């Protein structure tokens, strides 16, 4: 189980990304399309004033059950430990143990 502070920090970052993603997209596209250097600098200064935690790359994939960030399976949204337990109990439809 991850620390509660790490999970809370992740939630804050998700909210910030959702709030500022449209502004970031608008500033970015306007900055790329702008011809004059002064206007481009002004637009990028607005982009720099946005919070750092509103960047999408700051987010970390975490298990929905435990909050663990390592050993994460994207297709299920679970860590490897929880995935194994749920597969053994038959809670994941279509998942079977490999046998050869």
Curated annotation (Swiss-Prot):
Protein localization: Plastid, Chloroplast
SUPFAM superfamilies from the UniProt entry: Glucocorticoid receptor-like (DNA-binding domain)
One GO CC term, this protein: chloroplast
InterPro entries, A to Z: Ribosomal_uS14, Ribosomal_uS14_bac/plastid, Ribosomal_uS14_CS
Keyword terms: Chloroplast, Plastid, Ribonucleoprotein, Ribosomal protein, RNA-binding, rRNA-binding
GO BP terms, alphabetized: translation
Alphabetized GO MF terms: rRNA binding; structural constituent of ribosome
Function as written in the Swiss-Prot or TrEMBL entry: Binds 16S rRNA, required for the assembly of 30S particles.
Family named by the database record: Belongs to the universal ribosomal protein uS14 family.
Quaternary assembly: Part of the 30S ribosomal subunit.
PANTHER family: 30S RIBOSOMAL PROTEIN S14, SMALL RIBOSOMAL SUBUNIT PROTEIN US14M
Protein name: Small ribosomal subunit protein uS14c
Originating gene: rps14
